[in-house]
Amino acid sequence: MRTFAPWILSLLGASAVASAADATAEAPSDVVSLTGDTFETFVKEHDLVLAEFFAPWCGHCKALAPKYEQAATELKEKNIPLVKVDCTEEEALCRDQGVEGYPTLKIFRGLDAVKPYQGARQTEAIVSYMVKQSLPAVSPVTPENLEEIKTMDKIVVIGYIASDDQTANDIFTTFAESQRDNYLFAATSDASIAKAEGVKQPSIVLYKDFDEKKATYDGEIEQDALLSWVKTASTPLVGELGPETYSGYITAGIPLAYIFAETKEEREQFTEEFKFIAEKHKGSINIVTIDAKLYGAHAGNLNLDPSKFPAFAIQDPEKNAKYPYDQSKEVKAKDIGKFIQDVLDDKVEPSIKSEAIPETQEGPVTVVVAHSYKDLVLDNEKDVLLEFYAPWCGHCKALAPKYEELASLYKDIPEVTIAKIDATANDVPDSITGFPTIKLFAAGAKDSPVEYEGSRTVEDLANFVKENGKHKVDALEVDPKKEQESGDATETRAASDETETPAATSDDKSEHDEL
């Protein structure tokens, strides 16, 4: 199961929050402020719009503000407007747009073609992403615009395919459409341009502003092969990890090796020293440097001591495995090279972070830790409802008394376990995208847990267990009093939920503390 810890993104962006928190809103702005009265008209009048739905008190919104502003200025000359909507003032508009957290960024091509912005929240990333959105999936290349197109983005993929090769053209176009959010694509059928670039038709060339500057693919034009090649060719031999690059690395499908260093000089030195190792293992593992002064806390998530640098660790998101390198040893390329090879050869046991297994279970909710996860969650014939929580999570704290009440319903029902695990203190083999996350591991189907997305009330959670569990236990029927009380809970739910989100929906089903 592929999984990673998305809350790391908050660590990678945390340093920006404080510096941006006091940014003034009085200066002239290229970001257009819209209201319920102006939003629809503005969107209809523009072919492409990026909209931010925010709240003034939101820390992540404050951190984004200067980057969003700068991106708006850079995109203004390209006629790509960036707008913002204050959801504390425009609740109805935000509710209509399905806003469930802050900030929410959405791309509009008119009112009926809306999709979420899925790039990084950095100026360069926003500009790059929106420029790609403004272009066709595949831009035409001519002798006159070739050099311009090659440098339009950090990564540009150009297909040199003859016009009569319909199969290759169709596959390349389909591939470009599927990846247009990630890369800028162009193509030409002009054989003279291909010859000038030193390639034969059909070939795909990836131009980049780092390493060897370009890479050529002359294999079979096939979707999966192209995707694998583009991902590998577009990744620096030794990159720099930050908020704008984290997601790409962690979803690449191969292990990620981290080199933590506190100074720019150290990171540059490690980059040069590790290039030959990165070249040797290209396509099998990615290697990055990371600023330990800004993001050193992430070392703790890799089971390293976050106070001792330089440091090295490998993370395999596909297996949710972590391999910290012995911090008593110096980080030397030769030794690390052997360590990497041993990890790839499965000769190194992964490190598992776990709290101590409780000597006794106190209270109705079963406490799970990494070392008891297999026994309590997976290796049994029970329906197990498991909450993944974080101690600092406000929504988790609000859920706690209701979750305990839920667990009390099942205290005499051996077929069902209501459990929780601190996902910040234990390595968990599941994909967690927010806190709290609640999953039901049904007996006989432990490898395909069902995530709960409903309202967090006792009766709704109990019904979820009944409907999705193997044993179909109806705890409310066992406790008729609870069933009688469910009507009162339903009546009060809407009122309490209005304080949870900007869009006052009927429940709090999508509420997570932002990660």
UniProtKB/Swiss-Prot annotation:
This is Protein disulfide-isomerase. One of its GO terms (cellular component) is endoplasmic reticulum lumen. Residues 1-20 form the signal peptide. Residues 472-496, 506-515 have a biased composition (Basic and acidic residues). Residues 472-515 are annotated as: Disordered. The gene is pdiA. A motif (Prevents secretion from ER) lies at residues 512-515. The record marks G59, H60, G394, H395 as: Contributes to redox potential value. Residues 21-136, 343-470 form the Thioredoxin domain. The record marks R121 as: Lowers pKa of C-terminal Cys of first active site. Disulfide bonds join C58-C61, C393-C396. The record marks R456 as: Lowers pKa of C-terminal Cys of second active site. Its EC number is 5.3.4.1. Keywords: Disulfide bond, Endoplasmic reticulum, Isomerase, Redox-active center, Repeat, Signal. Participates in the folding of proteins containing disulfide bonds, may be involved in glycosylation, prolyl hydroxylation and triglyceride transfer. Gene3D superfamilies: Glutaredoxin (3.40.30.10). It holds the Pfam family Thioredoxin. GO terms for molecular function: protein disulfide isomerase activity. Its main location: endoplasmic reticulum. CDD domains: PDI_a_family, PDI_a_PDI_a'_C, PDI_b'_family, PDI_b_family. It comes from Aspergillus oryzae (strain ATCC 42149 / RIB 40).
